[in-house]
């Protein structure tokens, strides 16, 4: 079970870093284009040398962020390949899947818990152990009752004296044949309370197993509740991040127009660009967090993680 969760988490981490790399590459290209534009404006006296320096610094910062994003992607890919026990990560890549988020209503915790009771191996194993303890009690109680046993035996012997051949080997086996049959009735009147102690021990074991099962169920329910609330929070965060991206895209568009018309400084333009970049990164993080949280709920419902 842990392997499935770990692989899913590692896989989504790779996709997360893949998208961050694309955002970083896009922002780097945008910074380069803007830097070229400011240099041209400076050449005709419409931009200061300070703005040119700021633009070049912005390009350098974005290039560094791109390198870091690509390194994070490669490290995440390495972690996944090692988790899958691939001989080498060389040539190991992932195709970009369709990660469009469809907000289906989340299954209620109680319903997930009901499904989990029938498919979680830990719960099933605890239930089987508890059922087996009832048989152990009956076996221990059987010593309270009289026991009738049956036995049978058959045997023969052969002997010889030096120089005597009066009786052959075959005749001796036949003549000396002994047969026996018997019954034994055991009535447990007093056995130093051994039977009672064995029954008590079996009942105590049953009580302990029942407590273990109950505790396992409680832990499972708490885990499901926590997973459900985490999914709800992740959904809310993703919705908020999408709204933030929409707002920052519009803000950046307006700031770009103002900067092009000379009504905004490069610092103001760069701040709007940074806000947009951050909101895009937050959205990507929120998306994959939501996807992971919903996969956890599927895991508790016994669904294959796909």
How should each PLM-predicted stretch be described?
Residues 1-13, 148, 152, 193-196:
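Short flexible linkers and secondary-structure junctions
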Residues 2-115, 230, 234, 276:
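Periplasmic alpha-helical coiled-coil/stalk elements that build and connect Gram-negative outer-membrane
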Residues 6, 17, 58, 143, ...:
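Outer-membrane beta-barrel pore domains and translocons
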Residues 16, 61-86, 245-303:
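Short segments within alpha-helical structural elements
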Residues 25-26, 50, 54, 124-128, ...:
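Sec/SRP-type N-terminal targeting helices
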Residues 49, 159-163, 194:
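Outer-membrane beta-barrel proteins
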Residues 95-106, 138, 151-187:
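Small/polar, glycine/serine/threonine/aspartate-rich low-complexity segments that form flexible
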Residues 129-132, 136:
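Long hydrophobic segments that form regular secondary structure
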């Amino acid at each position: 079970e842990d392997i499935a969760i770990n692989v899913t988490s590692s896989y989504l981490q790779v996709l997360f870093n893949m998208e961050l790399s694309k955002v970083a590459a896009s922002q780097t290209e945008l910074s380069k284009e803007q830097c070229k534009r400011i240099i041209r404006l400076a050449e005709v006296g419409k931009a200061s040398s300070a703005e040119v320096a700021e633009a070049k610094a912005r390009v350098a910062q974005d290039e560094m962020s791109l390198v870091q994003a690509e390194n994070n992607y490669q490290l995440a890919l390495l972690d996944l390949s090692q988790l899958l026990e691939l001989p080498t990560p060389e040539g190991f890549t992932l195709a970009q899947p369709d990660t469009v988020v469809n907000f289906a209503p989340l299954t209620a915790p109680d319903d997930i818990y009901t499904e989990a009771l029938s498919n979680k191996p830990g719960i099933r194993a605890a239930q089987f152990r508890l059922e087996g303890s009832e048989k152990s009690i009956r076996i221990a109680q059987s010593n309270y009752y009289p026991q009738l046993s049956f036995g049978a035996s058959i045997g023969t012997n052969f002997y010889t004296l030096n120089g005597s051949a009066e009786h052959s080997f075959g005749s001796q086996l036949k003549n000396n044949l002994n047969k026996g049959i018997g019954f034994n009735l055991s009535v447990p009147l007093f056995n130093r309370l051994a039977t009672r102690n064995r029954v008590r021990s079996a009942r105590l074991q049953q009580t302990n197993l029942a407590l273990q099962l109950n505790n396992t169920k409680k832990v499972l329910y708490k885990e499901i509740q926590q997973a459900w609330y985490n999914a709800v929070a992740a959904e809310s965060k993703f919705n908020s991040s999408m709204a933030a991206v929409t707002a920052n895209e519009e803000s950046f568009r307006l700031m770009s127009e103002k900067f092009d018309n000379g009504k905004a400084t490069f610092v103001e333009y760069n701040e709007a660009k940074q806000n947009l970049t951050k909101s895009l990164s937050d959205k990507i993080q929120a998306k994959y967090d939501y996807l992971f949280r919903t996969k956890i709920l599927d895991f508790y419902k016994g669904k294959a993680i796909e």
